[in-house]
Amino acid sequence: MHDKKSPMANSHYLKNLKQQFRNKNLIETTIHLVKCNDHDSLAFLARTYGVPPQLRHVVWPILLKYHPMCISPNITSNTISWDPITNDFILNDPFLKSKAPTDKQDKSDDENILPYDIESIILHDLKKYFHSRSNPAGSSSNANTTNIATPTPVSSSDASTISSMEVLSPSLDYEFQIIETLKNAIVKFLLKWSKIFKYESGLAWIALGLAEWYPIYPYETMSPFNETHSFYEVEDYVVLSGRKHALLSTNNGNNGNSNSSSNNTNNNNTNITSGMHNLSINTNTSLHNSPYISHTLSYLYKEYPLPFELRSKLPTKPIFSFSALFERLALVILHCPDTILAHKQLKNDSNASSSSKANSNFNTNYFPIISGGDLSFQTQVFFKVFSSILPELYQPLTEESSLQPSSSRNSWIYWWLKCSGAKALQRQDRGRVWDLLLGWRPKPNMDTINFFLNYNDKKMDHLYHDTPQCDNEQYWMKDWIALYNNDPFWFPDLDSMALGSKKFPYDYSVFKELILRNRYGGTQSKAQKDNTVPSPGSDSNDKSELKLPFSSIDPHMQLIFIFIAILQFNEFKLLEFEEAEISEFLNNVPLLTKFDDSSYRKLYENTESSITSLPSSPTTSTMASLQSSSNSSAHISNYHMLIEVGNDAKASHCFDDLLNMAGDIWRKWLWRELEESSL
């Protein structure tokens, strides 16, 4: 007799089933796109659906290789600032001004020497991440836990092999090598960019956040990076496993040695934390000529399983060294448009205008909500949106000292905005947020690219395409585009406007047109009719009709609305918190994407250890099921103005819900601003 399940239980089961269908097909699609180097489609999937955690170490380097902010970088400076009174740049005291100078200070003109004792401070910040190697209060074997371990050659025949592996206790020397490699990556960045950016602790946490998903080679300082080093042939690659998960006991409660083959000569095993699991990796390599898997890549595949048949399709050689990839990630996170140039251009255009009103109000016209502003502007917008969207929460929290903006590097707003969630967000949530940052792409024409990168003097539009470039792209990408045929931060008619053109050179000119087009009772302008593009997900056999949707606004502005959505998601909880609890929440945001994370962890839980056959592309039935379940929320009309904020499904713990909420907040807030403006 079958058990009767409640409608809610059945609904939850079906939701999990559909999510697993989607995730499995997303993994297969991503692997196919990686194989054919279709970075445009990979970027689309990253910013909309997110990169599967099993594949970030492969996808992120591709996204950063072609990221516009890496090809033409410009980062915020903490060494100089613009003085509007003197109309000139002034030097800022560096962050370490309170530190006593050392002998190195006299040699600061040497390009190979950093001012002050930077390296020791970097090491101090990095060591905060790792657990203590000794615990006087306890003498159990669990006291010697850490976030990394010595890599070991292992068999990689299938996912179940990794599940039964054991871990060797890491040595202090090996841990020091990892920290040293992280430090060297930061030092290399500073040596290149120190004239405009001095060291901040955020760099250490950005490096650590990257190391949680991308393998580092801890002996890089002794053995130079070689692109022939394979993730699977070199046993010393390491992926950090996170610092904010409690140590759990194993199922059998045994912290000693597990049963292993007689060929395993090392019996000194211990358990260490990896994600939310204690995990053991066996050093037995019984299969002849089996490839070597990095110890903590095995951790990654234990935490987020990936069958061997799929892993075997991945490239094994890294595109970048860890230090090179860290530089590119830092360039994206610290990116800032040239605000001084923007003010000058706006002023010159205002002076050339015959309108005296435009000339007198050129400063008020600089409101780069779409194209992006500096950190000061981002902070201003964050609190402006916060007070407008969540007034009940904003008022009591602003009375608490924990929410006050601060210049301290320990301020939560520093970690949220300037460091894009480093340190403050959980590893899983931060990875998803960084997917969005790395997947950001404007429309592939120079006018639009220069609208966002106003300082750019490089031609790069030939690197990007508005159609999928992989083989059989209709079969692989059509359904994915149909499911998410608009950028999450769409706004009515914004996608049809030629950003950066002579008609729309600045944000305020775009705002004027948006008001004109969306005014109640207004009619569609001729320009709108001429520039309206067909839906990317429209059914057509013509390849040119299969268009990728591109990003509508600056990625750092997107993060502002995502963070506001996080506050709204936890609004009732925060209203009940004491000040200390609020401070803890802001500086250590609880895991937000439990549903997504659990789905990826259990994705291949019920599959056979060895998959006999895999589809070459997503199955029609699976994608049809996925499409039918997603069209209601994801397939949104680009001209829909009924903007609602908030819903009753706050317990889903799904990033898609958070992203949709952020998009709703963006549209509601911007429309309110446009209605109240004098444009």
UniProtKB/Swiss-Prot annotation:
Keywords of this entry: Cytoplasm
Localization in the cell: Cytoplasm
Ranges where the record places region Disordered: 135-159, 250-271, 524-544
Residue span(s) of domain Rab-GAP TBC: 50-441
Entry annotated with the keyword Acetylation: no
Main location: cytoplasm
SMART domains, per the entry: TBC
InterPro entries from the UniProt entry: Rab-GAP-TBC_dom, Rab-GAP_TBC_sf
Bias (Polar residues) ranges: 524-539
One GO cellular component term: cytoplasm
Biased composition (Low complexity): 135-153
SUPFAM superfamilies to which the protein is assigned, alphabetical: Ypt/Rab-GAP domain of gyp1p
Family the UniProt entry places it in: Belongs to the OCA5 family.
Note: Present with 12500 molecules/cell in log phase SD medium.
The protein's role, per its UniProt record: Required for replication of brome mosaic virus (BMV), a positive-strand RNA virus.
Stated name of the protein: Oxidant-induced cell-cycle arrest protein 5
